[in-house]
């Protein structure tokens, strides 16, 4: 069993309020959950209007499948025109960690 985590650091477009920020972040989180069956949430930069951090976690039987799912998640977020992907952090943990 392998657990994978992926964190996205995002720069949002012309956002002036936290309400506007939620309107950008919520659809991304929902799409990650729906398309890839992962746990996803806004995990950081909660009080900043133009920045967002989204965290994703997945559990799989093997590392290859875990990497495949995380790669798909990264492609989905990178392909969103309303956000700029500044950085990603990926970690894989197996049963021995």
Which residues make up each language-model segment?
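N-terminal first-folded block
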Residues: 1-39
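A structural signal for short, well-ordered beta-strand segments
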Residues: 6-10, 54-56, 88-90
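A general secondary-structure boundary signal
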Residues: 9-11, 42-46, 67-72
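Glycine-rich, flexible loop/turn motifs
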Residues: 14, 44, 88
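Residue-level signal for beta-strand positions within conserved beta-sheet cores that form or flank
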Residues: 36, 52, 84-86
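Short, charge-patterned binding micro-sites
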Residues: 41-62
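C-terminal structural segments of small proteins and small subunits
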Residues: 60-97
């Amino acid at each position: 069993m392998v657990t994978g985590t992926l964190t996205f650091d995002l720069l949002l477009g012309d956002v002036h309020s936290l309400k506007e920020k939620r309107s950008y972040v919520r659809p991304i989180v929902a799409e990650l959950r729906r398309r890839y069956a992962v746990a996803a949430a806004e995990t950081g930069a909660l009080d900043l209007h133009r920045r967002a951090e989204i965290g994703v976690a997945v559990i799989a039987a093997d590392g290859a499948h875990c990497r495949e799912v995380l790669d798909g998640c990264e492609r989905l977020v990178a392909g969103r025109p309303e956000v700029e992907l500044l950085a990603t952090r990926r970690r894989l943990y197996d049963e021995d960690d």
